[in-house]
Design a protein with these regions (language model features):
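Accessible peptide chain termini
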Residues: 1-2, 248
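Noncatalytic modules at the cell exterior or secretory-pathway interfaces
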Residues: 2-15, 183
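Short beta-strand-plus-loop segments that form exposed binding edges in beta-rich domains
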Residues: 9-18, 222-226
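PRY/SPRY (B30.2) beta-sandwich protein-interaction domains
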Residues: 24, 28-248
Length: 248
């Protein structure tokens, strides 16, 4: 049997004990230490980099939060959008009436005939003056006083209040969510009965029928908070693997 090993090289420096410097197998030299071949340059790519601008960027078929949506401008609270359009920081303010205190919304409408899903990591909320869900372009804020309907909106507040086009549900701990929760939003515009389902840490939190004529909708979040309160949400529209599998 012919060995593929064709040579060995022993190296000794100034009388020191020698070491194996290279091995040649089938004409290929394996050396120690490694040396650069030609004009090769190091790369700054890091496979463990979690910065979305570096890993994937903002281009592609995925939604992000829309920093150009006028509702995210200063409307009492101030909305900051960063991390490639996937993180929003909200700082409370009271310049406008409650129902007009703004939203952050996705760049894409949710087209009819499909199922849509996103996850929201609730990194911090100062109180329950914040809501998540879907909203049409007509919605300028999540909050309406006194149980009034909220046309174009299906939004769940942290204390469990739910705002929808023909009414409002009151506080309910069974629908509540808080700092540290991972909220999934599943919108089914494909089935005969259209629905939005809210998940908390993979468990169903609440489901409501959607009137598609109130749309088109975008994923949205907003706060009604006054000064001194802040909130931070991290969205995933599919740019990265979801923590929990989307529903069928």
């Amino acid at each position: 049997v012919t060995s593929p090993l064709t040579s060995l090289s022993l190296v000794s420096n100034s009388g020191d004990a020698g070491y194996l410097g290279s091995v040649t197998i089938d004409g290929t030299m394996l050396r120690d230490p490694l040396t650069v071949n030609g004009d090769s340059l190091a790369t700054n790519f890091n496979p463990f980099n979690t910065d979305i601008n570096t890993v994937r960027g903002q281009e592609g078929i995925y939604a992000t939060l829309n920093a150009k949506d006028y509702r995210s401008f200063t409307n009492g609270p101030t909305y900051y959008i960063y991390n490639g359009g996937l993180t929003t920081y909200m700082s409370g303010g009271s310049a406008n009436a409650s129902k007009d205190r703004g939203l952050v919304a996705s760049t894409m409408d949710l087209p009819s005939g499909k199922k849509w899903y996103c996850e929201i990591n609730v990194e911090n909320i100062s109180n329950n003056d914040i809501a998540l869900g879907i909203a049409s372009q007509l919605v300028k804020g999540y909050y309406e006083l006194g149980g009034n309907p909220k046309p174009g909106a299906y939004l769940l507040r942290a204390a469990g209040q739910f705002y929808y086009p023909t009414g409002q549900l009151g506080t309910d701990s069974s629908r509540s969510w808080a700092t540290g929760d991972l909220i999934g939003l599943a919108v089914d515009l494909e089935s005969t009965t259209k629905t939005i389902t809210f998940y908390k840490n993979s468990k169903v939190l609440y489901t409501h029928i959607v009137d598609e004529s109130e749309g088109p909708f975008k994923f949205a979040a907003g706060t009604d908070a006054g000064s001194g309160n802040d909130y931070k949400l991290n969205f995933n529209f599919g740019q990265k693997p979801f923590k929990f599998p989307p529903p069928d």
